[in-house]
Amino acid sequence: MKTLKYAWRFLIRSKSYTVINLLGLAFSLACCIMLMRYIHRELTVDTHCIDREHVYGVIQDMDGNRGMATIENTNKDSIYIDHRYIEKRTSLILMEQDFVSDEASRYTVRTLVADSCYFQLFPYRIVQGTPIKSPESALLTEVCARRIFGHDNPIGKVLHYSNGKDITVSGIIAEPTCKTMIQFDIVVSNTLSSFWERMPIEFVRFTPGTSIKKMNELGKQARWVNPNWKNIDARQYTFSFMPIADIYWEPAYVQDAGCPAMLTYGKRSHIYILSCVCLLLLLTGIINFINLYLIGTQRRGKEYGLKKMFGIKGTTLFLQILTENGLLVGCALLLAWLLIEITIIPVSRLLEYPFTYTSFDFWLSAGIWVILPILTSIYPFVKYNYASPVSSIRDATQSKRTVHTLSLIHISEPTR
């Protein structure tokens, strides 16, 4: 407690150095935290899937054009994939420019046509109502429900769907805490109609022990697009299975589906660049923090020298420096999160993703508060702990002009 009071008293007395150091570190941390949150979101896409490393999308290759498609098992020949190997299989149809209407208005929506197995592979939390139980049932996202019904209870409300049929809202689903590759507003059953305007895509989970290498070898065998019309249609295709976690990083496959508003993708090169920028910002902030801290403590060389003459232990000195840096980092973190909160709307628009607070934010802040004070305390501790008392006292007798000059140099230093 005495060390904490002493550290706080020093920071209050050195107001100019404290404020400059606090603001510099806060801006650096705010930028780094924003970037790390974005990188974390990109690396955890579709983690709501039951096992994104072992749920596979079907990638079809036809005349060099590769995209997401389905498994065709119409002919049970030597290259047929036995259904016994498939544990779960879901077929989806993406209706990007779709609409629903009520008595007053018409609403543009992104419709996901799905079967019941989709929610077994990609669980969503139902915050109100029940899952789809009939062909005429539909699920809405919370955002879509507010857009259409406002604050009214949407459960049981009837909407007129684009195919001419009426659908009843049976439930409201919450947005997952993670980013998802498939974006939608409304989910309807694939049994609502026997004919849809778009081709489906499929996701598959194989039974335990199934060799994905063997499945891909079967998929490499060329198949006829129209086996009964080979003389007229000479097109052939192959397919392969790719984990959900990898499809997101393949823009060509996602863009081939032709639904840019419903299928998102990422680029690894962007993650590498942003990671380097984040690291450079953090290093710049740490170096400037240490330099300014040393300027602020330069006058205390006499104090440290006298304490060493009276036998102060290195542990006590390190604890004192660590406490001061811990207080500064803690205050800088609070200010950084305030800056993040103020800028969250423009940043979300820039990065095209609405950020929400998750447990990652807590652990990130806790990690910074624990690790950063230790890193920034090592060099000042080594400088003063291993210097002779006479050297520390002599350094403290330098004129105030030197200290002020160093301060002006650091303050006027251009932003990196």
Label every PLM stretch briefly:
Residues 115-127, 138-265:
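Mid-to-C-terminal secondary-structure elements
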Residues 264-279, 364:
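N-terminal membrane-entry
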Residues 27-31, 35-36, 327-345:
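Hydrophobic alpha-helical transmembrane segments that constitute the membrane-spanning cores
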Residues 1-22, 260-263, 293-319, 323, ...:
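Alpha-helical transmembrane segments of integral membrane proteins
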Residues 32-152, 161-168, 217, 416:
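Structured, solvent-exposed hinge/loop segments at the ends of secondary-structure elements
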Residues 55, 199-202, 301:
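Short, solvent-exposed beta-strand edge segments and adjacent coil->beta transition regions
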